[in-house]
Amino acid sequence: MNMPLHQISAIPSQDATSARVYRSKTKEKEREEQNEKTLGHSMSHSSNISKAGGSSVASAPVSSFPRTSVTPSNQDICRICHCEGDDESPLITPCRCTGSLHFVHQTCLQQWIKSSDTRCCELCKYEFIMETKLKPLRKWEKLQMTSSERRKIMCSVTFHVIAITCVVWSLYVLIDRTAEEIRQGQATGILEWPFWTKLVVVAIGFTGGLLFMYVQCKVYVQLWRRLKAYNRVIYVQNCPETSKRNIFEKPALPEPNFESKDGRGVCHSDTNSSCCTEPEDTGAEIIHV
């Protein structure tokens, strides 16, 4: 029985390794080509987008873009109105806040204190050091009140004047009649019952009048305090800690260096010209003229 014959080819080891290297190189080349193709597609897509965007930007007018200041400002500004300080309204440091919240105008802070009715910073909770002063009398302003409040005050004042006049006149009449009865009683040695009745009525009327005047005077005192508070100016002092810190944090002025590093001479700078003076030769002879 004849068996089929298979041809077996023996390849040396060196040829096998070279074939493997060749295959790996071809695979790497194929991968690189694929990567280049994908990169080419993405670059072409991005270039198309950039061209479209560039054409739209070029077609847009220049005036359509808002003009904003990009340059940073190194000057201090008020944290309420965001304005700089000047000679008329300087900036103060009333609390321990730092950074952009460090400075504030005196007038802005006064208005904020009046509107919020607080005496401390809302951020660092530092109590302001305040000094109050009253305006001169000729500069006092009228208290802001409604017409109904003014009408009530005028009626109250008129009623009180009339009531005080009546009470004083009644007391004068009662005291005069009582004194006359006392003189008559001293003559007879007996005081009649109407005398004690009049005395009790006078005492009750006097006590009631005093209580009524006390209650009404409290209302007038409150109005007076409101008027004083309205014509009072509040000055907020600088925080002592921040003022000391600002003094210590001021940069020292650089001392002028009159000696050059190479020791050749002294350079003097001027706005119009600059010159360098050479050192004098110590060995030069002095010529007498």
Curated annotation (Swiss-Prot):
A zinc finger (RING-CH-type) spans 70-131. Pathway: Protein modification; protein ubiquitination. It is found in: Golgi apparatus membrane; Endoplasmic reticulum membrane; Cytoplasmic vesicle membrane; Lysosome membrane. Keywords: Adaptive immunity, Cytoplasmic vesicle, Endoplasmic reticulum, Endosome, Golgi apparatus, Immunity, Lysosome, Membrane, Metal-binding, Transferase, Transmembrane, Transmembrane helix, Ubl conjugation pathway, Zinc, Zinc-finger. Signal peptide: none annotated. PANTHER family: LD02310P (PTHR45981). E3 ubiquitin-protein ligase that plays several important roles in innate immunity and adaptive immunity. Mediates ubiquitination of CD86 and MHC class II proteins, such as HLA-DR alpha and beta, and promotes their subsequent endocytosis and sorting to lysosomes via multivesicular bodies. Possesses a very broad antiviral activity by specifically inactivating different viral fusion proteins. Targets and ubiquitinates cytoplasmic lysine residues of viral envelope glycoproteins with single transmembrane domains leading to their lysosomal degradation. This is E3 ubiquitin-protein ligase MARCHF8. It comes from Bos taurus (Bovine). The gene is MARCHF8.
